C-alpha cells in the first residue's frame, strides 16, 4: 500500500480515545507518508489537535444532532458524509464496533473497511458495513492490543510505536 489515505473512527469517550492514540503513531511509523484522519466527537477533538501523527481531525456532532434533531442537523449530517466521500479514503479503521461507526465506514466510500470480529463488536450489525474483520479476540484483551490486532488485519505486520504524543 503506497501512501494510503486512512480514516480512523473512534468518536468517544475520553479514555477510549486516549487508549487508541497508539494506533496513529503505529501507522505513522509503518507508513510515514500516509495521510491519517481521525473522526471524533466534537468535544474530544482538542485531544487529537496538534498530534504530529494525525493529519486531520474531523469533528462529529452526534450528541448535538440527537439532542436538537431538525433540518439543520440533517443538513450537517449530509455535509459530513459528502466531506468524507470527497476525501477518497483508501482505508477505514472502525475501532468502535457500533452501528453508527459502521454506517459511517460504509458511507465513507473507502474500498477497504476494517472492523472487529462479530463476537468483539458491541453492536453485531456493525459487521455488515466492514469488509475485512480482525480475528476473534479473547475477552479481557486490552484495548491497545485489540486495536493493534485490527491494524495488523489491515496492513499486515506492523511495528508498534511504544511512545506516542499526547
Predicted regions and their residues:
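Catalytic machinery of carbohydrate-active enzymes
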Residues: 1-166
